[in-house]
Amino acid sequence: MHKILLAEDDNDMRRFLVKALENAGFQVSPHDNGLSAYQRLREEPFEMLLTDIVMPEMDGIELARRASELDPDIKIMFITGFAAVSLNSDSEAPKNAKVLAKPVHLRELVSEVNKMLAA
């Protein structure tokens, strides 16, 4: 079973994502901010980081950067309402990261997660 670390500060969106991913057969560890997600990542390995970009305490780009330092093989996907401006060329986000724009459709999310984990 694939393990996904989820960082999303919006409670409803986080519950929505957890339910969709668990129904698709993934094990999900949900967190409401980047700092707590990073602390969890330091405790155990995950195959994927699924994160919002704009969050309190530590934003998703910083979380992704640190996650890549801990585990260069971790797959990273951003889910954000700010997709158009989120990952410009000056961004410190990992180059292989995928971005999905909110609102995200469950079928698309699960499909993209499966594609990234299979790569």
What are these model-derived regions, one by one?
Residues 55:
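Receiver (REC) domain active-site loop signature in two-component systems and cognate sites
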Residues 8:
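Conserved acidic carboxylate
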Residues 12-23:
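Charged docking surfaces used in two-component/phosphorelay signaling
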Residues 33, 59-62:
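Acidic catalytic/metal-coordinating carboxylates
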Residues 52:
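Active-site residues of response regulator receiver
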Residues 25-32, 40:
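Short hydrophobic/Thr-rich beta-strand motif most characteristic of the beta2 strand and flanking loop
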Residues 62, 83-101, 107-112:
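Alpha4 helix (beta4-alpha4-beta5 surface) of REC/receiver domains from two-component response regulators
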